[in-house]
Amino acid sequence: MINQPRNRILPNKNNILGILGGGQLGKMIAMSATKAGYKTHLYCPKGDNPAETVVNSFTHGEWDDFDKLVEFSNNVVCATSEFENIPSKTLELLANKTSVIPNSKVFRSAQIRSKEKEIAEKSGFKTPKWYLIKNTDDLISASKLMENGGILKTNSLGYDGKGQVRINKHSNLFEIWENLGSVECVLEEILEFKREISIMYFKSTDNSDGFFPISQNHHENGILRKTIAPAILNIVDERDLRLKTKKLSENLGLYGILAVELFELLDGSIVFNEIAPRPHNSFHWTLNGCDNSQFDILIRTMCGLPVKDVKSNGKWEMTNLIGQYENIISETSKDQDYILYLYGKHETKPGRKMGHLNKQIS
């Protein structure tokens, strides 16, 4: 595996940054790279890829097309991914050819829920009670230990509420197991919480680091609908949360950015939910609410440029545009304080993120 770069990568014709994945996050990563003076090369399968419109070059290929991946890696000085569920063999191949930020260990930990929880617990986070489920016998036994029911989640390849089902004592466990593909799962207890929050830590390959202000989030059906930031958290809790997040990042060997999603329970305690080693929907407000957005900071961490804590320039609200969004735009267009971001996706589907709105609220 190629070591993480220590020398600064400055903009020039030979220093091309690689981006894996052609969606809205890849697009916004590329736009920040361009703003900073870098050229970008995108790798993604053919499809509805809005990032293709803003990069300098792109390669269409599947995630197991190793010849094309090698060609891509030979053309970039380092690479990052817009999503965590990139195949392990793909990451291993790329890591032997170029510098991948964050590293493959970070991505693997984010892909497997059980590993994610184990490393969170090792870092000092409290997690929901959970059980690894390998078969229906495990599921039956573990479900009896969940007094208030639980959430059965596939151990890998789940995001935005996909690959998970709530269960209770009346559930048909055999049917649910089959519907999830009869694959390894985790069963988590259902928590009563006051709110959902997220924190983002970042570390440059020059070893400087920092945090963004904390976000408060509202989800519906597993999909983020609205974020308000900065979230108000008492100083002791915020300091403790930063320490644990930094410890988690150290245990992962992180360079790049890391979002950590959490629950604040009714008693004020904070419980780990999951990580995302990439730009995160709950920090899209930073595009307007900070001097450096999460995408700008990712570029700096990739290129070994110094970073530090980022402060907000007020209180911001981010609203996702999901599925058919025209009515929302019709209403919000009456208020010039809304800043509209459309991702340029051609096909509208229920539950698909099509854009977002940012607005300063104080």
Predicted feature descriptions by range:
Residues M1-P5, K13, R300-S362:
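Peripheral (often C-terminal) accessory segments that flank ATP-dependent C-N-forming ligase machineries
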Residues M1-Q111, D137:
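ATP-binding N-terminal substructure of ATP-dependent carboxylate-amine bond-forming enzymes
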Residues A51-E52, N155-L157, T348-R352:
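Short, flexible turn/loop "capping" segments at secondary-structure junctions
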Residues S109-S198, F202-L248, S362:
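Active-site nucleotide/adenylate-binding loops and adjacent lid/helix of ATP-dependent enzymes
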Residues L180-L233, R239-F272, A276-H284, I299-D309, ...:
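Phosphate-binding core of ATP-grasp and ATP-grasp-like enzymes
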Residues T286-N288:
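A conserved FAD-binding loop/helix module that cradles the flavin
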